């Protein structure tokens, strides 16, 4: 038994050293996304009040968030009409900027809950479609604070594929190997984190002009559903 443990640990160490050597010698691929998120997302919709916000509540907090997440572009824009409010948050990382797990560390399950929100519902890898086009599977949750309940769909897109946050019993020591299995050896692909939140349910929102334009714009982020390999 002891010998088996030693062999297993040795294999893991060799794998880690090999990966570090690979990532040091092989440069990350060139980014394919060249547009500014603020230009890409709708900013003028008849009958809707649209506003851009800092990535957090204050410039200081926004600076800290930016330093922590190290994104290359980001946008936080809200759309309001009567009693309907939609929040759109998108962050972008060029290849090699951040690890997949680090970039995905600001999901509502972490940031929102840490800041006082209660998670009432959660679903993983949820089918999501618009205008007969399928998106990569989404993450879904319902979060509430001070009687303000928000329905949230979010995606962490890695090289065009959704990164799932479904919990498993696999120890964290194998997390890098799981990423390689799912995304290939080059773990330095373009990443987007997209979050859509609203005080209304999404079946209602899909009939609105704002949601229609938002979802149409998101196709440019390579979020179409990919064939399972």
Labelled PLM ranges:
Residues 40-44, 81, 147-148, 187-189:
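A generic structural signal for short, non-catalytic loop/turn and secondary-structure boundary residues
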Residues 25-44:
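Alpha-helical transmembrane signal-anchor/signal-peptide segments
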Residues 1, 33, 55-64, 203-204, ...:
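General structural signal for secondary-structure boundaries
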Residues 47-48:
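Short conserved aromatic/hydrophobic patches within beta-strands of well-structured domains
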Residues 3-17, 23, 27-28, 121-229:
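A short, solvent-exposed beta-edge/loop patch
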Residues 52-183:
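Short, solvent-exposed recognition patches
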